[in-house]
């Protein structure tokens, strides 16, 4: 029953998000005022093209994960916790949808925490499958709370300087306050706080455990949406709210954000190369890809912004595909490491094929969506004269090819180890 409610709610959310995309395409941005109080005093939802696409991404990922959970929950979660699981999942989905819809900076904090609270509980529920889910959930709780606190402190600085929490009104008032130390401190606190939520290096310690040990339903949904929503909010603040776009915080972006993003792209790719557990490998890969997106944003140009958002959407689809394929294989074949996945294509051809397609796109094989997104980032970097970013992207892409190649080699070309468990219950996932 709880699964049916979850699927029905997710179908409704996806349908509404699709309708919203159509309305925005026809009429431009949409503003909805709550309670009859006009902004900036009243609470407002404001949806533009990017917000509508993010809503569609979140709702679609939620629908796919909800449908998928019909087979995975019985194996990964105790029966008495199924209702709790689906309730938390819908709460998390609602919070993220509110986050990309609101036009109020404080309500963005509220929605961010609504989604996070649901996520903490959902990761912990995975302890039935792996006891490491409990410390992973606790680590996420601690880091998430620190990130939320930083965001709230930064928002307090901005409110003290502007006297408003409405994003559009705040942007208008900040134009004359660009030299304010209070505003600059608020900028730094907000970017760092959201960076923790987005798993920005070196504040990403919560992510590998959360992705690796959570139930498949949550791994799929988190991989597609959680860090992406925080990155979306960073982009909103950097390009839409602070004066003169990203040029306002250019010193912070140039000397802090961009170097950390470059380090993440390379260091976390190296960690993925040497990781043995498949889910943790994909988790480190996600941190590296966050670095790719932040490098695009750090260019402080419209081309960099569009390239970063394209890469964000592409990566969400790729990671959702990869975690669904890994989850399907793990349910039937009971594996964790690359050695245990060896030769799996013979027993599970369809899931292996999906895994191969997702891996190829993640590596940036030509004609895939991953290649197109990386190419757009490279073009933006060259247009901005930032050749060093192109070099970083090239090195990180080669490292991506290495760890993706390990997965493909194990799945398609390596012989299965003697006595390895193979398809259970007669299924061919």
What are these regions (language model features)?
Residues 4, 340-343, 422:
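Internal alpha-helical transmembrane segments of multi-pass membrane proteins
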Residues 113:
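Short phosphate-coordinating micro-motif centered on Lys-Gly-acidic
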Residues 1-87, 168-172:
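Transmembrane helix-loop-helix hairpins at membrane boundaries of multipass inner-membrane proteins
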Residues 64-74, 89, 93-108, 120-375, ...:
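Hydrophobic transmembrane alpha-helices and their helix-loop junctions in integral membrane proteins
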Residues 414-429:
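Interfacial loop-to-transmembrane junctions
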Residues 2, 353-354, 419-420:
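Acidic/polar loop patches that form or flank catalytic/metal-binding clefts of enzymes
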